[in-house]
Every structure is written in C-alpha cells, then in structure tokens.
Amino acid sequence: MANVVVIGAQWGDEGKGKITDLLSRSADVVVRYQGGVNAGHTIVVDDKVLKLHLIPSGILYKNTSCLIGSGTVIDPKILLKEIDMLIDNGIDISGLKISSTSHVTMPYHRILDEAMEADRGSNKIGTTGRGIGPTYADKSQRNGIRIRDLLNKERLSDVIEIPLREKNGLLEKIYGIKPLKLEDIVEEYLDYGERLSKHVVDCTRTIHAASKNKKNILFEGAQGTLLDLDHGTYPFVTSSNPISGGACIGAGVGPTLIDRVIGVAKAYTTRVGEGPFPTELQGSINDQLCDRGSEFGTTTGRRRRCGWFDGVIGKYAVSVNGLDCLAVTKLDVLDELDEIQVCIAYDLNGEEIDYFPTNSDDLKKCKPIFKKLKGWQCSTADCRKLSDLPENAMNYLRFLAELMEVPIAIVSLGANRDQTIVIEDPIHGPKRALLR
C-alpha cells in the first residue's frame, strides 16, 4: 500500500491528468484536494478526448472511488455538465463523492472576478474569470456557501442573504452591474444540490476509512508549484495551495499518511497568463513548441507561453514539495530540434544565482544561464521502454534528473495512455533511483 501525491512542478498544464489517469489504475481512491474549474486536464482514451475540470481522472476506472475534497471550490453548474458528459460517454460515475464542506462558486463570484480583472487594466493578473479567487476570499472571510448548504432551502436562503447584499452593493455601486436576485439564486442552486446530493459525503471520514482498510490513495493536485498562493510567483498565482502540503489541508489528513510525492514536469516549460517567465522563447522555436505541444489552455483556450526547461524552478519544486520522483511529459515535442537548452542558473543584477527568487520583481530581472544539449531529431512517440529512446534523448533525461537531484519514474511521449514509459510504479514500486 502507498498513498501518493501528484503535483505540478512548474506553472501548471504539465500533463498531471494523464499521469494521474495512469496511476489511478493502481489506486483505490483518488482525491482532488484544491482548486476549482480554473484547472483543466485532458485525457485521451481509445482516441476519445475527455476534458475535465473538477472530477478526478480516476473516474475512468470503475472500481476507483473519486473524491472532490474539502479544499476545492465547486461550480455546481460546470460539475453537473462534466457528470452528464461522462454519462453520455458511457462512464460509470457511481464512485464520485463530493465533500459536504467544499465551498461553492456562486454567480456573483464569477461576475466579480471578471469585473475586478477588467478594472485592473494593465495590472491584470491573468485570472481565468471563473470566480475562483472571490470564492476563496469568501471562504477566508467565513462568508462562503458550502455544498451542504445546497441541500436545505431554509439554510441556503439564510447563508446567502448577507454575502449577496454585500456583493450586490459592489456590483451596483462600483462596477455599475445590475444586482442579482436572492430568489433566483436559491431556486437555481437548490436544484443543483438536489442533483448532487447522492454524491455528498464527509470527506475526512471517507478518506480515513479507506486508509484504515489499507487502500491505495492518490491525491491529485491542480495547477502547479509556481502558482501556489504562498510559494509561487505572487501575485501571479492561484488562490489555493497546489503544493504537496496542500493535500493534507485540502483532504483533511495528516502528513504521516503521505508515503510519496511525484512531481510532473514538461520536458520544456509553459505558462498561461501574466507574470515573469525567465526562459520564455520568442520566434520560430516558441511557435514550434506551441504547435507540436498543442499548447492551448483546457480551461481558457488561451495560447500558452513556451520556453526552455528551467532547472532552477525544477530544483525549487523538488524542495518545496519534497519530491521523491518525477514524471517528465511531452518529451516527443522536442523530437525535431537539433539543439535543446536547459536553464541551470540565473543572472540577477550581474550575480549568478542557482536558487529561485520568491520576489516576482527579482524574478523579472533574472536572465537564464543555459546549458546546451544535442537534440535527437527522430520520433520518440513509439518508444515503450528506455532502451528504445535515442541516445541523446536518454542523455537529456539524465541531465534533468542530475540537475534536479531526483529520479525520473515516468516518461510520457504523447497524449495516449500507451505512449508512456513507466520506469517505476510510484504506488507499488520500491523507492529507488532508476534514472538519475
């Protein structure tokens, strides 16, 4: 038995959905522990493309329970669309469970999110406009609505009244937006609650019961390390904690329950939205990475910014998450390049540094110091074991492992499940360095 946390080791969009889907075959329970519909993951099964935002990837396995944990924020309208999409595709969703204490994204959260971002003008932070920040803000101010509140009409009317009055004041007086009606919201969200009620559970009790019964539990993070509210490139971050420590808070478990942490990183780097990005590329190589990697956001459809692999960020992710091993994704995107560069340090005001500056103003000033490696200029898409890889591809992976001082357990070479080299099963395999 092993309980494993899967986190993004960059700015999100690393391919966690595929890796979580892969590991879910060995898991009894998959728990999504933070974030909301601002995250998205794409899974390809039998040439069928499934895009999910809230429901854990493990839902595709009939005997796997999938829990949306207390640390998430849920837009019930979008969640129900996902449920309907899965049912339409013949997928059994009876294993889906939703924490009764998850907070709910309300209509005023979405409207305020968009209005506040527009009001920032040139100082925008790149929010998805899905209401995530305002939902978490209400949670922190103890003014939020939880899933359990949607199950009782009288309670829902009571808990919405005060926050709605406050939000209507903001909408009307500051942004000139028509106020929302209490009756309309209560009617709409009671309907959502009724449809979701059979999935609602006590999150902590459910997870601890699984642990007591020696079940394998997989904790699935959204976004990535550099988007963490406390440890990312603030203010260009999300409103929750995607790092491994967030799994304990968002799922309601102690750190001793976690056996292993696996980080997911692309073989290059991408970022969506605003904020510093030291290795960002311009021109033809950027376009090539974007086009070959289909670098468009699952949630927003925005074109992702692309750059070389950043080892400084990688080492920071290893440290802040306590990574045991790494899954490297989209290695195949680099197949056609004759030369590949990896950032090994930064130049900050004329000084070489090998650490990640947590001050975004300093990070903006950082210039990458690169190590050049030879490309392999042949397809890796059909490789299924390490010995199938071209020598220079192996050299590249070894260099990343040595630079980050962490073993590589999985290499992904395409969107499909079978386009993967599993060097070590992070759930059942022993802890050992296999590619380093």
UniProtKB/Swiss-Prot annotation:
PROSITE patterns: ADENYLOSUCCIN_SYN_1, ADENYLOSUCCIN_SYN_2
Gene name of the encoded protein: purA
Subunit structure: Homodimer.
Positions that bind substrate: T298, T299, T300, G301, R302, R303, R304
Protein name: Adenylosuccinate synthetase
Top EC class, one word: ligase
Catalytic activity: IMP + L-aspartate + GTP = N(6)-(1,2-dicarboxyethyl)-AMP + GDP + phosphate + 2 H(+)
Lineage of origin: Bacteria, Bacillati, Cyanobacteriota, Cyanophyceae, Synechococcales
InterPro entries found in the cross-reference section: Adenylosuccin_syn_GTP-bd, Adenylosuccin_syn_Lys_AS, Adenylosuccinate_synth_dom1, Adenylosuccinate_synth_dom2, Adenylosuccinate_synth_dom3, Adenylosuccinate_synthetase, P-loop_NTPase
NCBIfam families: PRK01117.1, purA
